[in-house]
């Protein structure tokens, strides 16, 4: 997009729709690849505790590259950054198809994802602003969750048929995302001319961390989104091990169907948040966050498929309503202080550090033999208490 682009354009503009299509294909590949690679690990007789470790190497890339990816997103046209990042994902998926160690290939996908995230969210603030940004985030989350829904199911179903076919489908999805990125109009770089010295980049990133942490609103958003996504990723792996224990089902498809219900719910919750929550009323989302933990504990006690589907759908609705306003708040406030790209990179550091911690604790619980049901109950209760503490803290800071 040229310099004539102005913010606050329609969320159905050509630029916005191009971003959404590219995001859908990229997220589809991410989620199909996760379940296809988990099936590959199962087929190659890796131990159960290696499953969360697979995700840990992915989020480790986010943490390692966090000081750099925000500046990259703000120093170049964000659509082109997205295209380069999807190219890295394409290379990672293709390498797994060709027999490279799945942990190595998945790490490469993680590097691409780390570079992609600040650009995909930062570009929204360059295409629109204000309360339209909440709606744009809702559209982005809806697209992402639709991709999670379809990608997760496709990955599991195809893997039950043929693991390599599932991996090839992931590679093709990333290739489609690269092509879609070509149709994103070129925006002017948000912050060109920054230093590319390693020490200066690290110093600049941690200065951005300090600026965002000292602001009460952005600190609140960082903690809330970190807890949510850390819990969300852990729940995905918990479901994979919970299904054979609680339901007696051992295929690859059933966990993907159950995880897909969370995705459907997030679409609904994101839509509700776009209509009911503004940047001035973000605290309305907090009760939903507490209820997520309560419902996770209830879900862990189920032994029938139908109530499990219903409760995971409810978890998704609560999750979408909780996280979309927090994302929009950080983007709007962060854009004005440290730049949208840096704000999202700081957010990614927080989210992925939380994911790494939660996945590490979950992997440890699996290694020492804690039952899946007990793990789920404890996980849900702790999450509810954490969000309640965050809400109390935020009210005292106000």
From Swiss-Prot:
Keywords (A to Z) from UniProt: Cell inner membrane, Cell membrane, Lipid transport, Membrane, Transmembrane, Transmembrane helix, Transport
GO molecular function: lysophospholipid:sodium symporter activity
Localization: Cell inner membrane
Entries under Gene3D superfamilies matching the protein: MFS general substrate transporter like domains (1.20.1250.20)
Origin superkingdom: Bacteria
Predominant location category: membrane
Keyword Membrane listed: yes
Transmembrane segments: 19-39, 53-73, 96-116, 139-159, 164-184, 195-213, 227-247, 257-277, 281-301, 304-324, 352-372, 373-393
InterPro entries for this protein: LysoPLipid__transptr_LplT, MFS, MFS_trans_sf
Membrane topology: Multi-pass membrane protein
Pfam families linked: MFS_1
Gene Ontology CC terms: plasma membrane
Function according to Swiss-Prot or TrEMBL: Catalyzes the facilitated diffusion of 2-acyl-glycero-3-phosphoethanolamine (2-acyl-GPE) into the cell.
Family per record: Belongs to the major facilitator superfamily. LplT (TC 2.A.1.42) family.
HAMAP family, alphabetized: MFS_LplT (MF_01585)
Protein name: Lysophospholipid transporter LplT
Encoding gene (name): lplT
């Amino acid at each position: 997009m040229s310099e004539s682009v102005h913010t606050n354009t329609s969320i159905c503009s050509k630029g916005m729709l191009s971003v959404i299509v590219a995001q859908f294909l990229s997220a589809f590949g991410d989620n199909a690849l996760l379940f296809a690679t988990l099936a590959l690990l199962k087929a190659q007789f890796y131990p159960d505790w290696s499953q969360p470790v697979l995700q840990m190497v992915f989020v480790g890339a986010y943490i390692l590259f966090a000081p750099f990816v925000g500046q990259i997103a703000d120093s170049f046209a964000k659509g082109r950054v997205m295209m380069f990042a999807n190219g890295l994902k394409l290379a990672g998926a293709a390498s797994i198809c060709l027999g490279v160690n799945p942990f190595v290939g998945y790490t490469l996908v993680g590097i691409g994802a780390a570079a992609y995230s600040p650009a995909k969210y930062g570009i929204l603030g360059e295409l629109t602003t204000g309360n339209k940004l909440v709606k744009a985030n809702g559209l982005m989350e809806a697209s992402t969750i639709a991709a999670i829904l379809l990608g997760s199911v496709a990955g599991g179903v195809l893997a039950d048929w043929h693991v390599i076919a599932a991996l090839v489908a992931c590679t093709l999805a990333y290739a489609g995302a690269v092509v879609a990125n070509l149709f994103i109009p070129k925006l002017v770089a948000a912050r060109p001319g920054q230093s590319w010295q390693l020490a200066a980049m690290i110093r600049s990133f941690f200065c951005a961390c300090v600026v965002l942490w000292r602001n009460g609103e952005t600190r609140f958003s960082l903690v809330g989104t970190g807890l949510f996504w850390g819990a969300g990723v852990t729940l995905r792996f918990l479901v994979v091990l919970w299904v054979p224990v609680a339901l007696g089902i051992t295929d690859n498809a059933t966990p993907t169907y159950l995880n897909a219900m969370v995705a459907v719910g997030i679409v609904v919750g994101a839509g509700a948040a776009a209509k009911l929550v503004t940047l001035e009323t973000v605290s309305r989302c907090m009760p939903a966050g507490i209820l997520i933990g309560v419902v996770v504990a209830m879900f862990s006690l189920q032994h029938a498929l139908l109530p499990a589907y219903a409760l995971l759908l409810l978890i998704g609705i609560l999750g979408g309503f909780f996280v979309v306003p927090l994302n929009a708040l950080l983007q709007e406030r962060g854009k004005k202080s440290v730049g949208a790209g840096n704000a999202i990179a700081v957010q990614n550091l927080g989210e992925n550090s939380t994911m790494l911690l939660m996945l590490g604790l979950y992997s440890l619980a699996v290694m020492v033999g804690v039952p899946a049901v007990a793990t789920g109950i404890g996980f849900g209760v702790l999450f509810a208490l954490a969000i309640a503490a965050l809400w109390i803290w935020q009210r005292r800071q106000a």
